[in-house]
């Protein structure tokens, strides 16, 4: 019976199956980690939500700005993204500058639909955006103000996603080169001399490049055009020769060039500059001035952005305000000075920082350094699209100012919001950075939102990206994970934000460090960007500390600048890492014993966790890392209490809480919904009536979550042993028990849609009355012609009956008369019903129907020409089967090759059969030893342990056991944090102190091995075998989705060969190499048949089909269609090609007799009809045109 025990804060309702655990503690795992983290991991979805908050300037952002101003830290941008854009574009003036239009104070109304409504009815989750527009007529001084609707603006859901047309999407953050000034060094091709260059790169606008060439002359390149003298450029921007000489008095290289310069005035310099940039136009001083202004000094054309100003200030030691986003004379002078210092080999350069004179280090820039690469988050990406849309709108406004009557103009009449809406819609719908959210499991969703991509508009392309860009860089430490990246062409271009990483207002990733003062490690934590790392000595998190926070050793392993890690005296250490998992991403931090896995396998393990399918019954891992709770908690897939209170009502789909402040909160649970990846999205309550909950505590689990912990797979009993060759080459043998008990079963939900449209020949109709279809085929349809809920369906079954009017020839007068008398009844229709595709089966779990009448009543929107839309949801219960892919968390993947009866599996001495047999040869060459250590620790966690069972009280390994981990009951989940896990000697000690079973036996020895017995003979195996519990995942690569066979199917239009692929009901390609194989065997007739009858001999295949049906001998083959295509291609090259028979007579290759339909009719059957499994719709030729 359940007992209730009350502590100060939480009422714990303990049930017999839950070992008295508190479901709401951060994690109830026994943690073997020795390092205490001074701070918590930042909110995992903050990379998405914080950025969007800034864009729309909501309350959360305002609260952060207030706090920032109070602290004086300047870590939040103080102008919202929308305000920035509208301020930039205002005022829009006409060409005569007599009228102006100004925008201010954008705001949002409430969203029209809830998130749930948008998902159900295919809407976009958005809110109407309004802005105050003010039109001023300069001639009359009249001012007109209006609030203008700027379109529906997509909003972010609370979990960092967008709902666009009913589907959940994620905007991925982009990694791009930061605006700023960059210095480089290159070898001159001809003279082997080093040439130094500088580039000033803005956020928007023309590049400005300086160079000191092989003749030591300072040169400039304006907007990527021809090189010219830098002195001329300085004169063109308004400096006199004496001012240049004064500014560069300590730089002889510039003074030499100044002396050689023949031009004397600014006008001459402007003409010279213009002549070289625009050689075709007439050069005048005015044209030169206008050109330079439009390139570099017009704020609408040239924008450094706050980040560009920040980078220039830092690099050159100038002190301009961060909001000053234009280029100045001082920046250009400082750039040339720095370039000369670099050329002269100087070590330092005088500059200013925070009002003090400092010596800056002179060095070339590494473009792959994270101090020079920044993140464009979702807010900035949408802001850039908005800017593009508004600049298109600006053109329309200017035109309308000139064409409309000045008296009648209002802001509304000037503004056309279509270009703004179009750019935003295009971005969300088609941009490379707007991705279909990966909803396979909670981890895949969180990782998708934390992804960093170097691809996309303004980024790199995967074809041209070099090895250097893809490689792991020292500055990635604590910012981007060195492990998690795709295998394939995108490797290194797509990464994942590190666990503790966060993005600052300039878009640079920061990572936290603990401050160290005179060898004492404080709990004060400072976030740093990558360029600040270089200035400090940083010790690793594993450095041993005493209880007062002082270093135990005299020296510490630390990193200094870009060099390898070195031992330094503790007195010189400035900072220390906050946690060993700081370096890796969330996905990699979920792999226990990651430190014992080789890099490539860790990468595969990380990626495969995202492909794990949520099982019917989730089970959290016995061996975890302590990150599981956080991954599930921040995923948005659990339901958390908003306030402290007491649960008053619990059912499968609703939880009601009476809050302490007297209010009541209701929480709706999602039940058996379809995710983007067709997996089953279902939430289950884990609280009880009368239970006390605190704000933020988990009340309901989502898919692949158990008790608030991420639970992607199952803990299974594994033996590392070969078995009759069935687990050769990564194959896996599993026990029939996993099938019978639904241990690895999952539910998959497919959605099928059909609509009835208005065609030119009349309306399509949803009906049960279908032509040429027997009663048994429509037995499961209701009177409307729609399948009943609960029906078991398989490939070819009708889900929704639909008929479409057939195309008709011109009617004779007699027929028209009959039509007029007897009405439309004799009109012919075709069956175009929705059928279950080939290879699919399942149970109908839901039907949604929207008709034109319902839509108008509810305010729903059906597409034009559609009268009725029906969706059918079919759930499949998929048991584990031969061909499915299983994997551990260490890149140890395999395909199931055999399912053995439980009685044939090897068993332990107490009769327990193992669940899975893995090949031990999969471990040594792959070097992922983490799986073996996990196996041993899994056995320890399953059995329970008590270190006092070891008689040696002074054993060294006992000193490494943290307090609280001295003993545990069976089935206690344990945590072994990455890079701070259980040491091998501790594992060995714990294996010798596991709790004995009820017979008093220890089945597994201190070496982690046990004697197994052959299930078939009962004989023991000769050698002991490694046995233990490992966490196994069922991956989304399921054999049911891949297996496929073709009967009679569609053919390619041109070649008349069968199509390929499961989706097209295609055949298997008999390719070039297969042809060689048959040639090698001399199988001439088989080869001939493959290349004619079974492929594209149109006439022949019809005859063969007829002969098989009638039981006749097979006729000889005809001419393949592809041969005719070859002839046609040669004729198109004006080559006259003839085909001769054996007698040398030309054969007429006309196509008249090649009509397959006529041949088929002669034989008395219809080759065009395909079995129900393949018949989605009839031939395309009969398809009616839609209005």
UniProtKB/Swiss-Prot annotation:
Pfam families the record matches: RNA_pol_Rpb2_1, RNA_pol_Rpb2_2, RNA_pol_Rpb2_3, RNA_pol_Rpb2_45, RNA_pol_Rpb2_6, RNA_pol_Rpb2_7
Entry GO CC: DNA-directed RNA polymerase complex
NCBIfam families named among the record's database cross-references: PRK00405.1, rpoB
GO annotation (BP), single: DNA-templated transcription
Organism: Bifidobacterium longum (strain NCC 2705)
Record's subunit section: The RNAP catalytic core consists of 2 alpha, 1 beta, 1 beta' and 1 omega subunit. When a sigma factor is associated with the core the holoenzyme is formed, which can initiate transcription.
Domain of life from the UniProt record: Bacteria
HAMAP family noted in UniProt: RNApol_bact_RpoB
The protein's name in its UniProt record: DNA-directed RNA polymerase subunit beta
Region (Disordered): 1150-1187
Entry-linked PANTHER family: DNA-DIRECTED RNA POLYMERASE I SUBUNIT 2 (PTHR20856)
Assigned EC number: 2.7.7.6
UniProt family annotation: Belongs to the RNA polymerase beta chain family.
